[in-house]
Amino acid sequence: MSYIRTLKRIRNKKTNYRKRKAILISRRNFITIKTSNENIHCQLIKPNLKGDIVLNFSNSKELAKYGWKGASNNLSASFLVGLLMGRKMLSKNNDSAILYTGKTSFTSKIAACLKGVASAGVKIPLSEESMPDENRINGTHVAKYATVLKQDKSLYEKRFSKLLDNNLDPEEYPKHFEEIRDKILSSSFDQPQQQG
């Protein structure tokens, strides 16, 4: 018997080479979405045999520039990161892409981010059945839960402490989401003119 060594990126569960091969053969730009405990990262990548080229990048820390006071790792933030990414893509004439998840599973945060990219006007194949509900994305469920919890003042302040510290009333969460979405849609992402 002999030992057949597997590639390091397979052993570390970083790369699915069947999906990777399909991406390289298609020669289309692809979007990767990574979620962590605190942030959501979205990248537009151009595949290349010598190494992938990152064309655009967006993460949930950028939402603070638009006045986002909510959490940076929930469905609302994920949708807004996708919307921001889609606007950046369109400003650089990248109007289509496909999703590449690699070894990570398709979660609701990834689906919300993908829905945000599609809402910006980017052509991306997606199924509406796998997308989260609009009420979950805009935070209506948070506002409803806050109105129920408001009767118990101590529990209300404990559960919504970060929102209250950021001067955001939890009942106004959907309204705040709409404001930030409108700011992202109305902002311009024009490329700076190259000199020379």
Label the model's feature ranges.
Residues 1-196:
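Ribosome-associated RNA-binding proteins
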